[in-house]
Amino acid sequence: MPLVNTIHHSAFIYNQLKKLNLCKFYPNRVINHLISILISIFISGYHGKTTDFAKNSSCHRTTIAHFLNSGKWDDSLLSDTLKRSVIEIIYSEAARTGKPVFCIVDDTIASKTKPSSRALHPIEDAYFHQSHLKGKQDYGHQAVAVMLSCNGIVLNYAFVMYNKSISKIDIVENIAKELPVPPVMSYFLCDCWYTSEKIINTFAGRGFHTIGALKTNRMLYPFGFKKKLNEFAALLSTTRSHFHLVTVKKQKYYVYRYEGNLNGIENAVVLLSYPEKAFGNPKALQAFLSTDVSLSVDETLSYYAGRWILFF
């Protein structure tokens, strides 16, 4: 990055940190390290290594590594300040426009090379995790990311490393508990990992309905009879007459709307969905839950599709 651009971006970042009053709480050495790290993250060629940070700092990379690993500064102050700022921006936009707040949750794995069994210094907090993208165990760091969104504004609220000391369900539940009640009807968007009774109820207590993917072996109770979701879909898909063709982001899907009980959920909507060209294919079946039964099929799928404005 040219020097003039570095100076420009440094001044901009410094002013933003100043607006958050962080310059009052952190000494200059901490602010300078943060500015160097932030500039490095947003320039081309960033690889997530301390050597990248050193390129935009007057300090050696070992000094920056020491700051990150052992530096005497309260990183929770930075995290809490950023969270308050994100809440203020997103909730103010919701109050101004009447548009819903979306709390979007997902997790990802930063893959690392598996260390030798004789390695003296294996990568800290790296474990084997089940990768849904690769369909197998993957070695690396896993993190849970939480975004808040309203009216096209999308901001990172939290990024929590998962080190198996606390479950991902508990991580998300703790985040739900700390969120203020939004000024309008709002929604928690997630994949099937997080559509648990525990999380749904916690978000409901904070003013958020849940819209999320469901595993196809979840139990439904159509017409009062207990039936696995995929078995119920197989019965319905003998004919297209039970389904409605809808369009989401220029893609067409056959969708059946179920409203009723699930285990642990008294009343919700479940959408059974097949791509137009894969109708009746069990491997193409997808299911989505909405605890807001007032939403139309199109609204539910449109809201859920909004989670893919995401970050990975």
Regions found by a protein language model. Give the residues of each.
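Residue-level signal for secondary-structure boundary elements
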Residues: 50, 76, 94, 309-312
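A common structural microfeature
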Residues: 38, 50, 61, 99-104, ...
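A residue-level signal for conserved active-site and pocket-lining positions in enzyme catalytic cores
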Residues: 53, 146, 210
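Gly/serine-rich nucleotide phosphate-binding loop at the start of the catalytic core
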Residues: 1-78, 83
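Single, function-defining residue in the core of a domain
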Residues: 1-22, 26, 30, 34, ...
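Active-site-proximal, Lys/Arg-enriched surface segment
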Residues: 70-151, 252
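Short N-terminal helix-initiation segments at or just after the protein's N-terminus
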Residues: 36-51, 84-91, 128-136, 230-234
